[in-house]
């Protein structure tokens, strides 16, 4: 039986979140054993925030939740890909569909931002 290796990165693993229909990578976040289990049990994506040092469910503030369709691990069992149905217009806290909207072009990083919502009105911090 394969066991996910949480030890290589001090208890965390990268989680690549991918749109189940389009294949687009929506975001990359970190999970520990607890958040992976919460994700598998609830059918919603849960993560560990290294910045805020807390657990969080995707969409708990914005409403843009993610329904888990499929979970895969790599050959080393130290990373997961989670295919999801994205609920709401965007996965990124900036309001963009994907967190990957900055592209390297001609020697510089160029933002190709197309926010689908205003983060200032969604996140009341």
UniProtKB/Swiss-Prot annotation:
Catalytic activity: 1-(5-phospho-beta-D-ribosyl)-5'-AMP + H2O = 1-(5-phospho-beta-D-ribosyl)-5-[(5-phospho-beta-D-ribosylamino)methylideneamino]imidazole-4-carboxamide
One GO cellular component term noted in the UniProt record for this chain: cytoplasm
Presence of the UniProt keyword Cytoplasm in the record: yes
Residues the entry annotates as binding Zn(2+): 75, 92, 99
GO MF: magnesium ion binding; phosphoribosyl-AMP cyclohydrolase activity; zinc ion binding
Top-level lineage group: Bacteria
EC category name: hydrolase
Gene3D superfamilies, A to Z: Phosphoribosyl-AMP cyclohydrolase
EC number: 3.5.4.19
Residue positions binding Mg(2+): 74, 76, 78
Pfam families, per the entry: PRA-CH
Pathway: Amino-acid biosynthesis; L-histidine biosynthesis; L-histidine from 5-phospho-alpha-D-ribose 1-diphosphate: step 3/9
PANTHER family named in the record: HISTIDINE BIOSYNTHESIS BIFUNCTIONAL PROTEIN, HISTIDINE BIOSYNTHESIS BIFUNCTIONAL PROTEIN HIS7
Role noted for this protein: Catalyzes the hydrolysis of the adenine ring of phosphoribosyl-AMP.
Subunit structure: Homodimer.
Protein name: Phosphoribosyl-AMP cyclohydrolase
Source organism of the structure: Citrifermentans bemidjiense (strain ATCC BAA-1014 / DSM 16622 / JCM 12645 / Bem) (Geobacter bemidjiensis)
């Amino acid at each position: 039986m394969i066991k996910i290796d949480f030890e290589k990165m001090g208890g965390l693993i990268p989680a690549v979140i991918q749109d189940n229909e389009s294949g687009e990578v929506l975001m990359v976040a970190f999970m520990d054993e607890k958040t992976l289990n919460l994700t598998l049990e609830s059918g919603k994506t849960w993560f560990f925030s290294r910045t805020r040092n807390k657990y969080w469910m995707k969409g708990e503030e914005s409403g843009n939740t993610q329904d888990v369709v499929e979970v895969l691990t790599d050959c080393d069992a130290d990373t997961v890909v989670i295919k999801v149905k994205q609920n709401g217009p965007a996965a990124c806290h900036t309001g963009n569909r994907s967190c990957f909207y900055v592209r390297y072009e001609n020697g510089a990083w160029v933002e190709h931002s197309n926010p689908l919502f205003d983060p200032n009105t969604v996140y009341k911090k």
